Amino acid sequence: MWLAITEATIENGCLTSIAGSHREGPKVHCSNLAIAREPQVPDEVMAGREGTPLPVSKGGVVLFHKMNVHRALPNLSGGLRWSMDLRYHPVGQASGRPAFPGFVARSKADPQSELRDPQAWGDAWDTARDAVLSGRFTGRIFEDRRWNDAAVC
């Protein structure tokens, strides 16, 4: 789930999405691209396919499947475009971001495991941020589980 905190326009870098790409299965991701630290799907893998821009008003939400190919356009506005994303997955399943905390939103089997304290959530993120910035977190911030050794990478 992608939430627009401010208006997201084509000029200020809204998301783009390739319709139906989630049906094609996992895509090669490379973490050594110059454009971002987070693993990205190389342009060569998409063979020139362009995404459809998804402008969203402030407070608007975009929902998509985890295998949907998406990216943000560059922010050419000179202003701020602010958003947040929430990733939902079954309890115990890796998020792909081992440096960052997760939490249980709902559990019929174990309601006591649900995190309902926003201060506890904020504290967990503060601790994670401090560990990454100080160098105490020595693992990979993002999992490189998608064929980083592929020729295209």
Predicted regions, residues:
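Double-stranded beta-helix
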Residues: 8-69
